[in-house]
């Protein structure tokens, strides 16, 4: 923000797909997120999305890195207080309407949306100490599901992933 880049930031922790969505919804030039994704906490990474909301290609990443390497981070990169950025308007919180639009789009993508299904089916959900709790449970509830159990030990975000060292739901041990 101190370098003249307009910043839109979620006011609370949000999962990766919301950054991709907000990038498109707000018509921004790019989206950036620091995330552990489905990796162990020591592998937190930097994800960059293009204006289309897709992760940038290897070629685009190389171009960005080449520009970064031209900078003297001590002389060329300005910093400022976060609140000063908010006050100046260079940092803006993403409004709740974007989150609501994201949830609605997720619901619209459901293959069973609007169909007659048993809404009391037992659903067990684990955010794996990530950031999916609020959007997943909100979406399920708005779709009418009522029997949702959240795994308490993995409910809150924790980048150390204390109960699941490799939080990838595709890995069988993560779901044990």
Model-based region annotation:
Residues 44-174:
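Gly/Ser/Thr-enriched, mixed-charge loops and adjacent short helices
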Residues 1-43, 139-176:
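N-terminal small/polar loop signature for handling phosphorylated ligands or for N-terminal nucleophile
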């Amino acid at each position: 923000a101190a370098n003249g880049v307009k910043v839109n930031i979620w006011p609370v922790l949000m999962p990766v797909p919301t950054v991709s969505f907000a990038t498109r919804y707000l018509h921004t030039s790019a989206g950036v997120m620091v995330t552990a994704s489905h990796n162990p906490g020591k592998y937190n990474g930097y994800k960059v999305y293009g204006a289309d909301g897709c992760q940038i290609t290897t070629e685009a990443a190389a171009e960005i890195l080449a520009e970064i390497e031209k900078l003297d981070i001590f002389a060329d990169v300005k910093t400022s207080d976060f609140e000063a950025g908010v006050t100046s308007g260079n940092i803006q919180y993403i409004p709740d309407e974007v989150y609501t639009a994201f949830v609605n789009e997720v619901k619209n993508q459901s293959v069973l949306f609007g169909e007659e299904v048993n809404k009391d089916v037992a659903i067990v959900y684990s955010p794996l100490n990530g950031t999916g709790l609020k959007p997943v449970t909100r979406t399920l509830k708005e779709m009418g599901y009522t029997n949702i159990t959240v795994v308490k030990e993995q409910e809150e975000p924790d980048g150390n992933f204390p109960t699941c060292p490799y939080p990838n739901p595709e890995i069988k041990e993560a779901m044990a």
